[in-house]
Amino acid sequence: MNQDDRRKYLIKGLLKERPEYEDMQIPSDAGEQKMLLRSLMNIRMPREMDNAFLQIQDAYLSEENENKGIVTLADIREVQPDLYIWKGDITRLGVGAIVNAANSGMTGCYQPCHNCIDNCIHTYAGIQLRNYCNDMMIKQRHEEPTGQAKITPAFNLPCDHVIHTVGPIVQGKLTKKHERLLI
């Protein structure tokens, strides 16, 4: 099965879950298919998926990540001893962990093709990340507080882990309380 076949298989599998999309036609253009697949992954609520789907999704995302290019620590300039700064797509980093600017629900951004980092991380990690985060939040029984963090496996990302943290939501003027929440 090649990437085109995998992508179509995944789209069909996700469309089957949504009766309202039963008549939707899969576009012939690969770029449009990629956007449709990402959209379907983004709006999918956390729930189990069969192993055949997950294996094909994992193969698809692995190849997509390889095609984007994986950046290791050796590729990044050290600015001070043990301090490296990367400007770019963090879903390409093959490092110990990346940090996700998560929302308090911790299950990712549900807006189709939104380019926030939360959406990108959940897309390229695969649907297992949303399921894992959902299970974690069910056990926790409350939203994640600002300034706290949770660590998860990275699933299909080239890094080892994802650290999810919720930043303060500032509406109006920045206050001392907002500043304290950043520490």
Show where each model-derived region lies:
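Macrodomain-like recognition of ADP-ribose-binding/processing modules
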Residues: 1-183
